[in-house]
Design a protein with these regions (language model features):
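Conserved helicase C-terminal RecA-like lobe
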Residues: 408-597, 605
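Accessory N-terminal region flanking or inserted into the helicase ATPase core
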Residues: 2-37, 41, 45-46, 65-67, ...
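P-loop NTPase Walker
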Residues: 1-115, 216, 576
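Walker B catalytic acidic pair
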Residues: 229
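Coupling/switch/interface segments within P-loop NTPase motor domains and analogous charged loops
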Residues: 116-192, 439-488
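Helicase P-loop NTPase motor core
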Residues: 282-283, 289-382
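Conserved helicase/translocase motor-coupling segment
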Residues: 340-423, 453-495
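Conserved RecA-like helicase ATPase core segment
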Residues: 2, 235, 240-324
Length: 621
């Protein structure tokens, strides 16, 4: 690859970005580094700029690559897009961004023939769901009468605790037998080979640990590795990272924030920062910028540091803010009806002032429908849409959904360049078309895509849901399911693929039936015209102009006495989603928990915090 590389001395951040000192030190570092980066610190930009430095200076020497591992697919996609934006697609082709699950699955799928026969899964194994795991245990001889939650606690969650190979010295035989059923399937019980992602990670770790040639191949492929949201890393995931890169020349940059460690319930490793520093002899750098939140909101966030056992840091805010910017309210209501009245009116006022409707978010600790039903009804009376985002959040991240959305946009005359670029890129990958092909092949491909979109446009004048369903199916058939399954591992399950398409059909048709406008229907489906409502866990990594946290009550934080640190982290995550304003509500009467009568005795420290700041304005109704 011939290219004029930039010298490390002459390199400067892409797009004119000014990085704080420790961020710049991280970007150009040649050592393993743990970066402690709080909310709004610009973690995605930091990693994108580091990728640019490594690629543009050839510090990541061609043809080696950079591997970025994230928890969520959308986070992995966002980072990949940011790197492409900062240094161009040619250089970014050596930047791989994927989830832990995808990384582990690629290793197993590529090298599974190197596994001992006893641990080698079937070629076309499925991804196991909770009910599949339970059935495997039952086939293995377990008799368990509890519900699925009880089963997960007693058996399902413990299935992959141990590294392979499994021995009865360390684990009950029923677990080994269930592993075998899941690995190999069971014809007598019509059970196909099905693996959980935790099992896949254990198989990947075992492959690398027992085969030095595979470990060497991975080391030779990647000169640098980025680990995002590192505070949520599980022991299984960390074991895989160590198997791949411990004592290797690969340089690892791990970015996380202990104040946002809210995934302990999902197996996050409490000691992950300390373990990484000890195992990889990493340096530690702390970022002090908060580019997201207004100064007064950052002051509230800082008061949480002591309660989260974090060292006090002199946080700095973005220069776009004035010193007095930021609003915070604590609203105390007699009942949830009055709460809904006031919040709906407040939201209506914000919209009238020009705040985009999807830049306002309603957060709850749990049970979205319980805490937001009345608010949704009141907002509807004011012609403001609000919806439970959990129904859409994962769906909208799916590749097949993104493809269908872009096709319908282009067919509906909303011909945005981004959609054209995306469709040409993704269909080019599906059809195996490369930019280096001869002009005639490229031209034929462009004509094929345009004909597909023109045909879709010509058939948009449909009258019922059945016709819409047939139209969507015809577009998928014209590309072919096999191409989707070949490109996207998750779509090898035809049932999973069909379920996603069915959800798209139902959701978009509901919106079109209401608006009779395809652009509005797609916009509504994407949530551009509605207020998102979600749990704190679903809000992680997101930001909004204004946050309304509904139900700062004991019944919402019902397990606070048993997990105070994790609930404090959850509170901190909610607090730090807001850019300009945050409102907390308490209702003395609410149909939630064991009693309608609500209190805040257990979580009163949050209320004391509000008083201590002298920033949060308390309003009683």
């Amino acid at each position: 690859m011939k290219r004029n590389w930039i010298s490390t001395e002459e390199w400067h951040p892409s797009a004119g970005f000014k990085l704080e000192v420790e961020a710049m030190n991280t970007v150009i570092s040649d050592k393993n580094t743990l970066v402690v980066a709080g909310p709004g610190a610009g973690k995605t930009e930091l990693l994108a700029q580091r990728a640019c430095f490594l690629l543009e200076t050839n510090t990541c020497r061609y043809p080696k690559k950079i591997l970025a591992i994230s928890f969520k697919k959308d986070a992995a996609d966002n980072l990949k897009e940011r790197v492409e934006l900062r240094c161009g697609k040619e250089l970014a082709s050596r930047f791989e961004s994927k989830t832990y699950d995808a990384f582990a699955k690629e290793i197993v799928d590529r090298f599974k023939n190197s596994l001992d026969e006893s641990y080698r899964p079937s070629n076309n194994y499925n991804i196991a769901e909770n009910r599949d795991v339970r059935r495997a245990f039952e086939i293995a001889g377990l008799s368990f009468r509890g519900n699925q939650t009880d089963f997960n606690r007693a058996y399902g969650n413990k299935l992959s605790i141990n590294k392979l190979p499994l021995h009865t010295d360390f684990i009950d035989k029923i677990f080994i037998d269930a592993w075998n059923v899941l690995l190999k399937g069971n014809k007598d019980n019509n059970f196909e080979s099905s693996l959980t992602f935790e099992m896949i990670s254990r198989l990947a770790e075992y492959l690398i640990r027992t085969n030095r040639y595979i470990k060497k191949a991975i080391e030779m492929t990647y000169s640098n590795v980025f680990l995002d949201e590192f505070q949520d890393t599980t022991s299984i995931q960390y074991d895989l990272v160590k198997a791949c890169f411990l004592k290797a020349k690969t340089i690892i940059t791990a970015v996380g924030d202990g104040k946002q460690r809210i995934m302990l319930w999902a197996g996050a490793r409490k000691s992950i920062f300390e373990d990484f520093q000890n195992d990889f002899l990493s340096q530690k750098r702390t970022l002090i910028m908060n580019h997201r939140s207004a100064p007064r909101l950052v002051e509230i966030q800082k008061t949480m540091y002591n309660r989260l056992n974090e060292d006090a840091v002199e946080l700095q805010t973005n220069e776009k803010w004035n010193h007095e910017d930021g609003e915070a309210y604590l609203r105390l209501f007699e009942d949830h009806i009055k709460e809904a009245d006031v919040l709906s009116e407040e939201i209506a006022r914000l919209v009238e002032k020009g705040i985009k409707i999807n830049k306002i978010c309603i957060l709850v600790k749990q049970n979205v429908d319980v805490y937001s039903k009345e608010i949704i009804n009141k907002l509807s009376q004011l012609n403001i849409k609000a919806r439970n985002e959990a129904v859409y959040q994962d769906l909208l991240k799916e590749d097949i959904i993104k493809i269908l959305v872009s096709l319908f946009r282009l067919a509906s005359s909303d011909r945005r360049p981004d959609d054209w670029d995306y469709i040409y890129d993704i269909l080019g990958e599906l059809y195996g078309i490369d930019e280096g092909y001869k002009p005639k092949i490229l031209n034929d491909f462009i004509i094929k895509v345009e004909l597909m979109i023109n045909d879709l446009n010509a058939n948009l004048n449909i009258v019922d849901e059945k016709q819409f369903s047939a139209l969507v199916d015809s577009k998928i058939e014209s590309i072919s399911y096999e191409k989707f399954a070949s490109k996207f591992q998750q779509y090898k399950s035809k049932d999973y693929f069909d379920d996603l398409v069915d959800k798209f059909k139902r959701s978009v048709w509901i919106e079109y039936n209401e608006t009779k406008d395809w652009i509005k229907a797609i916009d509504n489906f994407e949530g551009k015209n509605s207020i998102p409502i979600m749990t704190i866990h679903k809000s992680k990594g997101l930001e909004y102009d204004t946050i309304f946290f509904v139900g700062l009550e004991d019944s919402a934080f019902w397990n606070f006495k048993n997990q105070p640190h994790e609930d404090r982290c959850a509170f901190f995550v909610a607090l730090s989603r807001a850019k300009r304003r945050i409102d907390f509500t308490f209702s003395s009467n609410r149909p939630a928990g064991f009693s309608n009568l609500q209190k805040h005795d257990c979580i009163n420290e949050f209320y004391e915090l509000f008083e201590d700041t002298e920033i949060v304005k308390k309003i009683e109704y």
